[in-house]
Amino acid sequence: MKKKIIILLSVVIILLMGIVVWFNIPLDLMDLDPNEVMEIVVFNGNSGNATHITDKEQIQHIVENLNGVELKRSKPSLGYMGYSFKVTIYLSDGNEAGDWNNFIINSDDTIRKDPFFYSVTKGNIDYSYI
């Protein structure tokens, strides 16, 4: 009986350590080739206006900026409403970019991609440009 409790506690501790490591591991925001991007749609949550960016120079600036950003999970985002900018990226084939698509930029150092808020740990988001 004692042996089962020790094994169970060991498994629980290992699982908790794994969750802590997973939660704290840094993530790249994206890794896209700017030449593969056809359009970036930025929806302003403050005004309700959407901006469709198709200019290649603007796309290159935004994608290269976001490619250089590294993030870390900071807290759960469930239950939070409202945002500054929602970013959707469309590729040359007309499909949305995978993984980090439809994310929300709340500030120059905070991104929301449910179910978490993410803090910038490397690089910076050119918030004023977006």
Task: Label each PLM-derived region with a short phrase.
Residues Q60-E64, I105-D114, I130:
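Short, surface-exposed linear segments at secondary-structure transitions and domain or protein termini
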